[in-house]
Every structure is written in structure tokens, then in C-alpha cells.
């Protein structure tokens, strides 16, 4: 029994020591990590992940600059190369007419699919003679909405208003 307890305590000590060493190593790595930005790839690099495999045109940036850039990009903002090869945040360009048509076509398809999903159980209730007056009215509103969606010109969109309620 005593040997088992000693073995358990020894294992626990080894685990705690390994955990402490990992934390110290991680903290050292974080403090020693350098960040770089490459204009030729429009990408970021760190010594932790890329070692010395960093493009020749890369410029060193601070961790806070890297965090600001990463957190600032999004739907309307993007990272690009500025003066002296340093990264900057700029407004994303407006989509081309072709890209906008593609986006609108995808939206149109998604809205039609949503309408179809709402219509199906309402239509079942009507077909089976089980629909309430509200369900019948809702079915007609959603069917009209779906027809209007099918008629939307993806190059010049005016989206119809979605019906209230979707049982």
C-alpha cells in the first residue's frame, strides 16, 4: 500500500513539474516571438511558426501592431501593403457588378429555399383540410413572397418584404 501511495505521489510530482516547465517554456517563447509582414505574399509570419522560412521582403512589426491589424480586418476592412512595405488597414473595394450579381443570386436562392421550407408544412395543413384561417393566410403570403423572389432581377435588386410569421 505504501509503495502504491509513493508511486502516485511521484507521478503527481512529475506531472506538476512537467506542467510548470511547459508554462515557463511557453512564456519564454511568447516573449521571444517576432512578427513579420511580407508585401509579396500579403501575409504575416512569426519566428515561432515559420522559424527562418520568412520571405526576404518581410518587415518586422510589433505584436501590438499585428494584433491591431488582425482585429481590424473584416467585412469592410482589409490588410494591404502600405509605404515601406508595412501593412495597413484599408477599406475593401466595392464588389464588381459580376460579383454583386453572384452575391445577389446566392441570397435569392437562400431566400427562396427559406420560403419553400415555410410553405411546405402550411401547404400540408391546407391539403389535409386541417389549416386554421391564420395558416391559410400565412400560406398565401409566403407563396406570394416566393413568386416575387423568383422575379427579382439579380443585377438590379429590390427585395420583397418577408411575410410576418413563419409557423
Swiss-Prot record:
GO biological process: virus tail fiber assembly
UniProt keyword terms in alphabetical order: Chaperone, Viral release from host cell, Viral tail assembly, Viral tail fiber assembly
Presence of keyword Chaperone: yes
Short name of one Pfam family: Caudo_TAP
Tree of life domain: Viruses
Keyword Chaperone: yes
Biological role: Chaperone involved in tail fiber assembly.
Family: Belongs to the tfa family.
Protein name: Probable tail fiber assembly protein
Amino acid at each position: 500500500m505504501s509503495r502504491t501511495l509513493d508511486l502516485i505521489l511521484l507521478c503527481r510530482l512529475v506531472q506538476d513539474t512537467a506542467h510548470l516547465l511547459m508554462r515557463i517554456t511557453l512564456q519564454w517563447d511568447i516573449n521571444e516571438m517576432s512578427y513579420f509582414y511580407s508585401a509579396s505574399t500579403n501575409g504575416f509570419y512569426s519566428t515561432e511558426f515559420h522559424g527562418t522560412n520568412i520571405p526576404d521582403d518581410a518587415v518586422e512589426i510589433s505584436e501590438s501592431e499585428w494584433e491591431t491589424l488582425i482585429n481590424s480586418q473584416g467585412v469592410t476592412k482589409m490588410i494591404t501593403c502600405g509605404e515601406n512595405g508595412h501593412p495597413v488597414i484599408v477599406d475593401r473595394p466595392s464588389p464588381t457588378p459580376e460579383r454583386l450579381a453572384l452575391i445577389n443570386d446566392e441570397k435569392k436562392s437562400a431566400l427562396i429555399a427559406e420560403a419553400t421550407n415555410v410553405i411546405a408544412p402550411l401547404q400540408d395543413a391546407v391539403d389535409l383540410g386541417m389549416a386554421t384561417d391564420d395558416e391559410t393566410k400565412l400560406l398565401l403570403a409566403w407563396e406570394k413572397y416566393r413568386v416575387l423572389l423568383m422575379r427579382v432581377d439579380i443585377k438590379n435588386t429590390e427585395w420583397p418584404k418577408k411575410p410576418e410569421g413563419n409557423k
